[in-house]
């Protein structure tokens, strides 16, 4: 007879809560909202240029300023989050409200007012409204993993599902938009393409919102949001206090914000157009190759989750970051020594090597993402242990504030870089010729910036105290404090 493997609760001596698999999958469908909108908003620079006549430089400034606004609204939402308690719950109300706000703004930005003679003011106002809706949806979703489970083995599993969806959704959207829709609209970014892309995105996001609401329904009740101390109204000083004293959160901000800045610069539509359309010379095939290399790499996330469940979130972030740095450096050398146009030739050795390198790169990046998902939930529990208050929106909002202030420069870096290449009044198109300046700019933005971000990650994580062993102690202390608080509550009731 085989012995039953002991659970994490039995091993650690802590009664962990666990979510059902279908609930985790429904939560992961939040990617249908976030990543489909992410794919669409990545084309905001094209909408601004085509639909509103805004210059490249002005677009970069607008997107940077609105991104900073996005960061400021994140901690402010914590106050709303703290006060929303309806008979329909907290999470579901905020998720649906956020979707409706951003859907109206995106429809106006890409369809309703686009190419109707409107200008900079209209575009900017619509973008601001979008930011408010996006913040409401995204910030609420970020608090859910810590609410669903605190089992150290299951948290990385939740990360696997979210990672898989976060990569699959933009891949599918990219295929639909660039391989199916773009050729039907003449092969260039125009108003017809932007309108159709917006309509598809809003339908996908609506489905995702409903599925997430279904997944969190059993957790969306008042007792879920109770801490280990008497609840007090949230104040702005609480946000400052969290940022000042939550060391794991400080480390996470430094590591993840730098990584995300590089990721967002490289994922801008204009950078992908340069790499796939101008350097490789076949944007449709380039998109297909990206999907081919991405799908198998999702299985790496399962390996990453198992590793993180065994060794902890911090160790997962550090080790997989080192692997990603090596693979990305090899990718740069590969582009330098070959003729990149050969990648665009179906079945060529260059194409096969590119797919394999992309597979390894995407796989290691997925393992980092899985580790990060688990780490953020750990940071929320660390704060509960440290301060006695269960304030997931404050922790995630504080992170998002600093994160978005840093990553707000992604759009201006990308648009500023292509402006240096001569694209001051227009945007790069797949049919443009490749020059040495374009090639090296793409290498720096697509591969160089991520390497710099990972170096910052390794430096930040050296001072992080949140090891696997420490997280077990954190959960034990939380359980003891909650039991003591409950006992004190019953004593007060009897008096």
Where are these regions (language model features)?
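Membrane-embedded alpha-helical bundles of multi-pass transporters/translocases
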Residues: 2-495
């Amino acid at each position: 007879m085989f012995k039953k493997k002991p659970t994490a609760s039995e091993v650690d001596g802590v009664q962990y809560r666990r979510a059902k698999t279908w609930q985790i999958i429904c939560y992961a469908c939040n990617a249908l909202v976030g990543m489909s909108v992410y794919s669409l908003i990545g084309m905001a620079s094209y909408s601004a240029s085509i639909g509103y006549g805004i210059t490249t430089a002005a677009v970069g400034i607008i997107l940077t300023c609105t991104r900073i606004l996005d960061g400021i609204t994140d901690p402010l939402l914590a106050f709303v989050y703290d006060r929303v308690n309806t008979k329909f719950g907290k999470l579901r109300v905020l998720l649906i409200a956020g979707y409706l706000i951003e859907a109206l703004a995106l429809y106006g930005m890409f369809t309703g007012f686009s190419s109707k003679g409107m200008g900079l003011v209209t575009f900017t106002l619509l973008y601001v409204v979008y930011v408010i809706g996006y913040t409401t949806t995204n910030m609420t979703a970020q608090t859910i993993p810590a609410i669903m489970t605190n089992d150290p083995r299951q948290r990385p599993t939740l990360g696997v599902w979210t990672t898989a969806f976060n990569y699959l959704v933009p891949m599918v959207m990219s295929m639909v938009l660039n391989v199916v829709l773009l050729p039907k609209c003449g092969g260039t970014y125009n108003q017809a393409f932007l309108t159709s892309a917006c309509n598809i995105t809003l339908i996908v996001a609506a489905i995702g919102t409903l599925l997430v609401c279904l997944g969190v329904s059993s957790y969306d009740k008042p007792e879920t949001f109770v801490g280990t101390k008497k609840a007090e109204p949230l104040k702005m000083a609480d946000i400052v206090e969290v940022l000042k004293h939550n060391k794991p959160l400080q480390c996470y901000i430094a590591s993840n914000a730098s990584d995300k800045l590089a990721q967002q610069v490289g994922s801008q539509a204009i950078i992908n157009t340069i790499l796939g359309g101008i350097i490789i010379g076949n944007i449709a095939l380039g998109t297909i190759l990206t999907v081919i290399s991405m799908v198998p790499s999702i299985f790496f996330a399962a390996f990453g989750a198992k590793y993180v469940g065994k060794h902890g979130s911090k160790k997962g972030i550090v080790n997989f970051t080192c692997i990603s740095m090596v693979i990305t450096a090899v990718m740069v050398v590969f582009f330098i020594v070959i003729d990149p146009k050969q990648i665009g030739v179906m079945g060529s050795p260059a194409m096969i090597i590119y797919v394999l390198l992309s597979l390894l790169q995407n796989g290691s990046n997925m393992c980092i993402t899985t580790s990060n998902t688990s780490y953020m939930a750990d940071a929320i529990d660390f704060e509960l242990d440290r301060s006695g208050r269960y304030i997931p929106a404050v922790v995630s909002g504080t992170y998002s504030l600093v994160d978005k202030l840093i990553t707000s420069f992604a759009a201006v870096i990308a648009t500023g870089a292509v402006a240096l290449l001569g694209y001051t009044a227009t945007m790069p198109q797949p049919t443009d010729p490749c020059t040495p300046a374009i090639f090296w700019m793409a290498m720096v933005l697509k591969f160089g910036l991520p390497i710099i971000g990972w170096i910052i990650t390794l430096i930040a994580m050296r001072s992080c105290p949140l090891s696997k062993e420490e997280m077990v102690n954190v959960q034990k202390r939380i359980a003891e404090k909650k039991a003591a608080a409950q006992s004190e509550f019953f004593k007060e009731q009897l008096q």
